[in-house]
Amino acid sequence: MSVTMREMLEAGVHFGHQTRFWSPKMAPYIFGARNKIHIVNLEKTLAKYNEAMAFVKKLASSRGTILFVGTKRQAREIIGEEALRAGAPFVDQRWLGGMLTNFKTVKTSIKRLKDMEVAVEAGELEKMPKKEALTFRRELEKLQKSIGGIKEMAGLPDAIFVIDVGYHKIAITEAEKLGIPVIGVVDTNHSPDGVAYVIPGNDDSSRAIQLYARGVADAILEGRSQVVQDIVAAGGDDEFVEVQDAAQ
């Protein structure tokens, strides 16, 4: 989970966008400009990153759910892999409007997806006429692509982690409406409005995206392992008392 400024530098986290496309609201996080490209102040990024990771770890330690969101080309694979590693839900293809604000309807689609997967496992596809099987398979693939990453999400997430806030304005608006905190990577060309935990930095480089996503996944795993340690510690005391009682 811990990241150094050197690692951020090597991942290109400090490279912002062209100065003419900047958002003045990101001024506090900008160090300066080089060759008409804004340079992000990594001292501030590191502090904000650590603050965000502490929040994620605390949330995970209280069994909270963090939804990973990264649907642009260079983020998709990384987001999916890191979310799976952390056992967290994710959206890596397209954000469907109402994914949070209309979660009741999404749950119906999740049930449909799970039922279809059960049918495939049971060999139902082989029993269908060719045309019907083709239609079934197409629907299944469409559902897997759009909501496969959230099929184990029983309810609304406790927070969402977003790569590129400008690219996911709808997701952030929905989260804001429902009071769900947003952890967001915000580049120099976007506004940090609506983002509770801002990570100022490059949102285009795959190495930078990997650094953020790995950090969030690690923080979730650390938070969860803290829960296990606490349970074991509590259980260990009980067991000790029982053994003592039995001995007497």
UniProtKB/Swiss-Prot annotation:
Keywords: Ribonucleoprotein, Ribosomal protein. GO terms for cellular component: cytosolic small ribosomal subunit. InterPro entries: Ribosomal_uS2, Ribosomal_uS2_bac/mit/plastid, Ribosomal_uS2_CS, Ribosomal_uS2_flav_dom_sf. The keyword Amino-acid biosynthesis does not apply. PROSITE patterns: RIBOSOMAL_S2_1. One of its GO terms (molecular function) is structural constituent of ribosome. The keyword Ribosomal protein applies. Pfam families: Ribosomal_S2. Signal peptide: none annotated. GO terms for biological process: translation. PANTHER family: 30S RIBOSOMAL PROTEIN S2 PROKARYOTIC AND ORGANELLAR, SMALL RIBOSOMAL SUBUNIT PROTEIN US2M. Belongs to the universal ribosomal protein uS2 family. This is Small ribosomal subunit protein uS2. It comes from Dechloromonas aromatica (strain RCB). The gene is rpsB.
